[in-house]
């Protein structure tokens, strides 16, 4: 931070900066609050989705155990692409899950167990939940990063920039006040000296 000059120009500069800091601080505080609320909301969504995943996997285990033969689902289900959208939250672009596109893999259903179709449907749900959880985690990471940056800025404004500007204004005001008082005193002394000089010359 540059050293302040005890001048009227610097006093105006400090007052302008203080005004700007006070105007900008509420915006930062609001952004911090919005980010916090959104993080809490997404973390709750993540917990709910995670519980859903656990229950589904338990149900799948129970369901698969009913059948003695194993089936190579990997060759039947292959993700082609995950379609995502983007949403702006308090200035942060976060990914939003949209859909999953699968490779078009064709097999002869005559030679597959009757329960495979149902199994594929369930596994697609499992895959989707996995993808959604990863995207929710990414959302939380992005928003947390911005929340930390915004919190640092709020602290900087509240604890450094605004107090420093106020202290500088006070310091300059005191100095200029002292200078003005000194000028008045010098003026009175000069006037008194002039009167004495005029009297002595008579």
Curated annotation (Swiss-Prot):
GO molecular function: ATP binding; proton-transporting ATP synthase activity, rotational mechanism; proton-transporting ATPase activity, rotational mechanism
Keywords, sorted A to Z: ATP synthesis, Hydrogen ion transport, Ion transport, Transport
Highest taxon, organism lineage: Bacteria
A biological-process GO annotation: proton motive force-driven plasma membrane ATP synthesis
Family of this protein: Belongs to the V-ATPase D subunit family.
Function: Produces ATP from ADP in the presence of a proton gradient across the membrane.
Name of the featured protein: V-type ATP synthase subunit D
InterPro entries for the chain: V_ATPase_D
Gene (name only): atpD
